[in-house]
A protein has these predicted regions:
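A short, Lys/Arg-enriched amphipathic alpha-helix followed by its capping loop at the start of a domain
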Residues: 1-7
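Short aromatic-enriched loop/helix-cap "lid" or pocket-rim segments at secondary-structure transitions
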Residues: 23-24, 80-84
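The substrate-binding groove and active-site-proximal loops of carbohydrate-active enzymes
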Residues: 28-51, 79, 166-181, 198-207
Length: 241
């Protein structure tokens, strides 16, 4: 019916496991490799179903002559499996330029081991070194803060709202880290091979260094051996402006 109505493509929501399991709409990303296959975060399925249901939906759309665009959320991770101790400098959420104190020890949920998946599809595990910043310290439980890890910096070439809007939520990926970039390339190629989607809707691009996605998309296009569609979301300013 969609094709008959003149639609040529469908944008599907984030298909991977979020922190709230089958209640998560997909933007609270926990495990990009779990498309509704593993018992993690209280459920096997995602909000949208199981891996097999997702793949069957893609096949049905393709059979109807429609292209499929996958919502792609690479900016952050949420719902770490264990806490780690690190040192970080505190900033206010609304001011990413002026520190609110000296470097301090923080306890943060930045260790992602994905025990339900047990290394299937990727053995990569996330540690605090793979992130720039977080917004919650178990020790202080303060709200309204951002903690920038020692030796890190907020990404450049991002929105200048709040002085620097690289940090959005959760555990903010460090796109300067070679291991992080390599893992995101590995995931993207796996996702293309697994789903055969025709392109991506890229989330939160104003929070990610502007140089990252052109390089990532070039790699995805080369791997797919065909042109891929790409669109993005970026809200600039406010409703008043």
């Amino acid at each position: 019916e969609l094709a008959q109505a003149g639609f040529t493509g469908v944008w599907l929501p984030p298909a991977y496991k979020g922190i709230d399991g089958d209640r998560d709409v997909g933007y609270g990303v926990y495990d990009l490799y779990d498309l509704g296959e593993f018992e993690q975060k209280g459920s096997v399925r995602t909000k949208y179903g199981t891996r097999q249901q997702y793949l069957r939906a893609i096949a049905a759309l393709r059979a109807a002559g429609l292209q499929i665009y996958a919502d792609t959320v690479l900016n952050h991770r949420i719902g770490g499996d264990a806490a780690e101790t690190a040192r970080a400098v505190p900033f206010l959420q609304d001011d990413r330029v002026h520190p609110r104190g000296e470097s301090r020890e923080v306890e943060v949920y930045t260790r992602f081991t994905f025990p339900g998946r047990k290394g299937q599809y990727s053995p990569f595990e996330w540690r605090w070194q793979h992130f720039d910043a977080v917004d919650y310290d178990v020790k202080t439980r303060e709200s309204g803060m951002v903690y920038l890890f020692d030796g890190k910096q907020f990404d450049d070439h991002v929105s200048l709202e709040r002085g620097n809007f690289a940090y959005l939520m959760g555990c903010d990926l460090d796109f300067q880290n070679e291991e992080v970039r390599a893992e995101l390339l590995r995931w993207g190629k796996w996702y293309l091979d697994t789903t055969g989607v025709d392109g991506f809707r890229l989330d939160a691009i104003k929070h990610i260094a502007a140089w990252f996605f052109p390089n990532w998309l070039d790699e995805m296009t080369e791997h797919a051996g065909r042109e891929l569609f790409a669109a993005f979301r970026a809200t600039v300013g406010s409703a008043e402006t």
